[in-house]
Structures are given as C-alpha cells and as structure tokens.
C-alpha cells in the first residue's frame, strides 16, 4: 500500500504543482466495495479516504455502488475524500477514453482532490501503449479540475509502464 501511494505521489509531482494538502506522515485508507457503504477507517488519526468509483476490467465498465456513500461518509467525518478508478486499459486508447468519459462526470469528491488511476492489472505487453493510456487519463483528470495520481505497485510498473 505504501509503495502504491509513494509511486503515485512521485508521478503526480511531474504533472502539476500539488494543490492537495498533505503533510508528511498523513495516513488514510483505500476503500472499495469490501469496506461497506460507509467505509471503515483503520485509526482515529486517519486523515483521508480514497474510494473506488469503479473502473474498467475484462467485463467492461463497472461501478462500485458504495462509492457515493463512502465519499459522503468520509466528508461527514471531516476527512479528506479522494477517488480512484480501476484502470485496466490493455494499452488501448479507446478503453482509456471510454473510461474517462464515463467516470469523470460522476466523481463526487471536491475539485482539486486526488483522482488516481489504479493500474495494477490489465496491461498490454506494449509498454509504450500502457504508458500513453496512463498519461492520457492523467491529462483528462487534470483538465477536469482534479489532481491526477498513478496508483500501482513497483514490480508491475517496472514490467508494464
């Protein structure tokens, strides 16, 4: 988990000055359907939640029915709320475009919050194509008024990006 956040934060630095407040040592949680409709914080000192809105996988576009209530719950508890999109593009720009077109208008977190592309499965053997779909998604996120972040893990990134 720490590697995913660190890699994403480093890549985000190359795209824009960070305008999302984060202090050294800030800790938060990664929520998906498994944490229920309200989500679950691990510790009282958690500062944020990053909730999965849904994404694209081998079956196509899907939504997480828990996303809206998890975001509302985080905000109601005074925590920062961020979004991530499962991003199995298979290096295909049409999939990347369809995913961004579908999810960007549905984001519930505040403008300037992080919107991460969770790319840890569904890669093509074409490293350049994978990289281009990620960069495309990050540009679209920025244009929509959010802070883009790449969310993955090191071995997968080294092999496919």
Question: Which residues make up each language-model segment?
Answer:
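Short amphipathic alpha-helical surface micro-motifs
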Residues: 12-15, 98-99, 152
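Substrate-binding cleft of extracellular glycoside hydrolase catalytic domains
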Residues: 23-146
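Aromatic-lined carbohydrate-recognition surfaces of secreted/lumenal glycan-active proteins
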Residues: 144-159
């Amino acid at each position: 988990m720490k590697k995913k956040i660190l890699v994403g934060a480093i890549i985000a630095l190359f795209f824009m000055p960070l305008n999302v407040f984060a202090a050294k040592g800030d800790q938060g949680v990664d929520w998906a359907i498994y944490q229920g409709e309200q989500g679950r914080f691990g510790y009282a000192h958690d500062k944020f939640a990053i909730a999965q809105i849904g994404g694209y996988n081998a079956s196509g576009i899907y939504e997480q029915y828990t996303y809206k209530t998890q975001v509302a719950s985080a905000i109601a508890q005074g925590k920062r709320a961020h979004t991530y999109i499962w991003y199995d593009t298979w290096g295909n720009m049409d999939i990347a475009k369809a995913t961004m077109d579908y999810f960007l208008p549905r984001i519930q977190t505040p403008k300037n919050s992080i919107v991460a592309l969770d790319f840890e499965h569904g890669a093509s053997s074409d490293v350049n194509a994978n990289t281009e779909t990620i960069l495309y998604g990050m540009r679209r996120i920025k244009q929509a008024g959010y802070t883009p972040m790449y969310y993955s893990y090191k071995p997968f990134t080294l092999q496919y990006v």
